[in-house]
From Swiss-Prot:
UniProt subunit comment: Homodimer.
Similarity annotation: In the N-terminal section; belongs to the carbohydrate kinase PfkB family.
A cellular component annotation (GO) from this entry: cytosol
Name of the protein described by the UniProt record: Bifunctional protein HldE
GO molecular function terms attached to this record: ATP binding; heptose 7-phosphate kinase activity; heptose-1-phosphate adenylyltransferase activity; phosphotransferase activity, alcohol group as acceptor
Lineage: Bacteria, Pseudomonadati, Campylobacterota, Epsilonproteobacteria, Campylobacterales
Length: 468
């Protein structure tokens, strides 16, 4: 089993308190909604959400921070310990009030947020820096999650960054405020468009402005990479040139914590020795998973893989239609010639691809009738098909020269041909001298030569022989 990457998160820890309920009336005391509480939940917020995102990705995580010597601070420390992300690097400061953000949620919407915190500079700067620098050699990457609550002061940032540079450890920062000078010499920052505009004094209205702002950040702060997150547009990177990586999100329910997800994913990927472009692409995917959830959330690789699978299916499934749907489409075809062929196409190979490409050359629209799993079993035996009908349909749909795929359950495509009324039928040359199903309806029948030695049966036999 591969060793887990070890990452240190330094920053402002918070407790997110969610009050869930229903709202169906207005208060008689004031023009405000009345929320009937159903349940309350607590999550780690701020830098704690970065931690949870890293854990979801499979990293080993330690946390360095300062919390108040109070009930909320103790709860934060206990929650981190339960997650296995304590590390003994969290200090408690007397007289400091730990951050807690209470959100009232009704009908999946946030009604109000109530903050309780002391957003002032910590008194334990030197102690925190000492804790961090004594342990830096244990980590592949350091992430600074700055929420402007006082933990990441100028001294703390500069001292940690300088030591990371000395030890050649990448340090990634989610910044806060207008003055980014304390982040000088970091590997990269992840400001959003608004934050980058405020930090550079450049109103980012177009790509030219974006390039100017992102270059200014890179040059003035001596960053290895300069990044700006662009919400629904994706992530912009300036390495040697400006490049924008499009966002992957299709459904957005809540953007809370999406920046934490981006920081965590970039850190994890760089700790795993991936290049920056691959890291950004993965961060976009992780963010797409998170914004489709309610509240601060995380994304794991299983969810990211499922997102990619669903995207792949969605891209191809628009070609997979019922006979009725295709018949309706063909009713509007005008002068276009429709070509029809059919088969099991169990293990798609080069012979299939050439056959279908040739079939498409005969007309303007190619429809493939695909035998269902039950139909294949009746024709080929109980050991077939190797691939399910949906998998076979998706693979066929991925071919540019296939326009539509229609699955049929009968032993022959006769009923399908009657419904679609194509202009041309195509079959393999082995049908020479034989009656082609549907030829009494469609008079134009074309036969295509197969590629010698290319067949699903031959492939299956080779696989079985190799296992002997």
């Amino acid at each position: 089993m591969a060793k887990k990457v070890e990452i240190l998160v330094v920053g402002d820890l918070m407790l997110d308190h969610y009050i869930w309920g229903s709202c169906d009336r207005i208060s008689p005391e004031a023009p405000v909604q009345v929320v009937k509480i159903a349940k309350e939940t607590h999550r780690l917020g701020g830098a704690g959400n970065v931690v949870q995102n890293l854990l979801a990705l499979g990293a080993k995580v330690s946390v360095a921070s300062v919390v108040g010597d109070d009930e909320v601070g103790l709860r934060i420390k206990n929650m981190l310990s339960e997650l296995g992300a304590g590390g003994g690097l969290i200090l408690s400061e007397k007289g400091r009030e730990s951050s807690i953000k209470s959100r009232v949620m009704a009908s999946h919407q946030q009604v109000v947020r109530i903050d309780k915190e002391s957003a002032v500079k910590i008194n334990l700067e030197s102690e925190l820096v000492q804790k961090v620098t004594e342990n830096l050699k244990n980590f592949s990457v350091v992430l600074l999650s700055d929420y402007g609550k006082g933990v990441l002061s100028d001294k703390v940032c500069r001292d940690i960054i300088n030591e990371c540079v000395r030890l050649d450890i990448p340090v990634l920062i989610d910044p806060k405020g207008n003055d980014y000078s304390k982040y000088k010499n970091a590997t990269l920052l992840t400001p959003n468009r608004k934050e980058a505009s405020e930090a550079t004094g450049i109103a980012i209205k177009n790509t030219i402005d974006l390039r100017a702002a992102i270059m200014k950040l890179k040059n003035e702060l001596n960053l290895k990479y300069s990044i700006v997150t662009l919400s629904e547009e994706g992530i912009a990177l300036f390495d040697k040139e400006l490049e924008i990586f499009p966002a992957e999100a299709k459904e957005v329910f809540d953007v809370t914590g999406a920046g934490d997800t981006v920081l965590a994913t970039l850190g994890f990927m760089l700790a795993s020795k991936k290049d920056i472009k691959e890291a950004i692409k993965m961060a976009n995917l992780a963010a797409a998973v998170v914004v489709a959830k309610i509240g601060s959330a995380t994304a794991n690789f299983g969810e990211i893989e499922e997102l990619l699978r669903s995207r792949a299916n969605a891209e191809f499934e628009h070609k997979i239609k019922s006979a009725e749907q295709v018949a309706e489409i063909l009713s509007q075809r005008g002068e276009k010639k429709v070509v029809f062929t059919n088969g099991c196409f169990d293990i798609l190979h080069a012979g299939h691809a050439r056959y279908l490409a040739k079939a498409r050359d005969f007309g303007d629209i190619l429809i493939v009738g695909l035998n269902s799993d039950a139909s294949v079993r009746r024709l080929k035996g109980e050991s077939r098909p190797i691939n399910s009908q949906l998998d076979r349909a998706c693979v066929l749909s991925g071919l540019g020269f296939v326009d539509y795929v229609v699955i049929f359950d009968e032993d022959t495509p006769m009923e399908l041909i009657k419904k679609l009324r194509p202009d041309i039928l195509v079959k393999g040359a082995d049908y020479e001298g034989k009656e082609v199903v549907g030829s009494d309806i469609v008079k134009d029948v074309r036969l295509v030569e197969f590629v010698d030695g290319k067949s699903t049966s031959a492939i299956v036999k080779r696989i079985k022989d190799a296992d002997k």
